[in-house]
Amino acid sequence: MARYLTVLGTQSHVGKSILVTALCRILKRRGYRVAPFKAQNMSNNSWITADGSEIGIAQAIQAFAAGAEPRAEMNPVLLKPKGNMTSQVVVLGKPLGDRVVGQYYESIESMMAIALNALYKLSEDYDVIVVEGAGGAAEINLYDRDIANIPLARAIHSPVLLVGDIERGGVFASLYGTIALLPPGDRELVKGLIINKFCGDPSLLGSGVGELEKLTGVPVMGIVPYSGLRIPSEDSVSLGDKKPEGLLDVDIAVVRFPLISNFTDFEALERIARVRYVSLDDSLGRPDIVILPGSKNTVSDLKMLKNSPLASEICSLASDGVPVIGICGGYQMLGRQVVDSGIEGGMPETIDGLGLLPVTTVFDRYEKCTCQSTKTVTGAGPLLAGIRGSAVTGYEIHMGQTRTDSPAFGDDGCVSDSGTILGTYLHGIFNNASFTDAVLKYACERKGLRYVRPEGVRDPYDELADIVESAIDLDAIIRLIESQDKV
């Protein structure tokens, strides 16, 4: 049975997910059997496990870092926002249905029970479970409905590391204030503080660290530098973060829909070329590649796209031979029509797509396809001809059925007669080197450039683990873990 370590934050986006990823790899390298856990995750970015369960992609990434197979128990409750205070609720990897906030909170006790049962089941197979919290640890307006932070740590008697983000300023106040807002009995769970995303010389923090330790009675166990590593991220807020300089002079424009989902599809590209996310009220400019990503609500985002200048820009670029690629909801939007019986938009309606691919998508039942897939490249044209017959892998998470007579990947997707407009339901397709090479090679050739595949880089999980391990008091953290009785 397992011991626990819980990582909570002073607020959202302080770096909890990436620190849990690092800790999973660090503990794995120390010989522990490790798994991640997040009771409740709110994200439109998800991963499909081997058995077809849907979990937050952050937990899948953390599992990979731990050398573990992603499982539904690692993220028992996934909330996928759809707008209008409504989220699709995914429980143990399967969609339960759409719920408004009030409806969801009515079932919060049962959700806590589900989360604890999943954690205990996971604990049977691992030595250490690294638990990630959600949002801020001391949201006092939600404390009685919180299943992911201090109430969970209290239930499992787990030591807590509290993380603050110095990059955004006010880290001492946020760490002190978070502890001060916790009920006295719960403050004792916080055993260590982590100052994250520090740039510069740690000695510049001066007496601040000592004063913080004196005020809180909790030791600072790490001052972690900003790394800039491209580990897949969870929240769309990270799309505005700093990006490293691209290796290729290829400009890739990704349409940033209001309800964008699975934007991690493009993080493999970000390590190779210049990727920018373009909002609907901006202009695409003259990119070398245009990508329409997945959407949590195709109907809503398609309507907004068509009412924006980007719709005509996409069509114009496509007619000029610029590669246009749609993934999942983006694929559906590239077609002739989207026929909705009320599943997506609430009312039956038919919406014209961009008309760039000869497909029609029909939403006629509340049924989601979730599976891992391996497809054979069957499409023709300049993007696919060079890799025709090869295999590509990915995963599908979508509602609606799309039919075509010009499939790109066996029974999936569609490719235009020109061969430069492509749609697919495969998330993660850019993780296939052969496909990515083919697309980038064509984009380079159009610019008169020679495409040279970037040389391999070191495993980013080990690189991240090295950075974090050198910046934390790992011995103290391991003592926290080992001091617990096994559950």
Swiss-Prot record:
Annotated Pfam families: CbiA, GATase_3
GO biological process annotation, one example: cobalamin biosynthetic process
GATase cobBQ-type domain location: 249-435
Cited InterPro entries: Class_I_gatase-like, CobQ/CobB/MinD/ParA_Nub-bd_dom, CobQ_GATase1, CobQ_N, CobQ_synth, GATase_3, P-loop_NTPase
Alphabetized GO MF terms: ABC-type vitamin B12 transporter activity; catalytic activity
Catalytic center residues: 328, 427
Pathway the protein takes part in: Cofactor biosynthesis; adenosylcobalamin biosynthesis
Entry-linked PANTHER family: COBYRIC ACID SYNTHASE, DETHIOBIOTIN SYNTHETASE
UniProt xrefs under HAMAP family: CobQ
Function: Catalyzes amidations at positions B, D, E, and G on adenosylcobyrinic A,C-diamide. NH(2) groups are provided by glutamine, and one molecule of ATP is hydrogenolyzed for each amidation.
Protein name per UniProt: Probable cobyric acid synthase
Protein's organism: Methanocella arvoryzae (strain DSM 22066 / NBRC 105507 / MRE50)
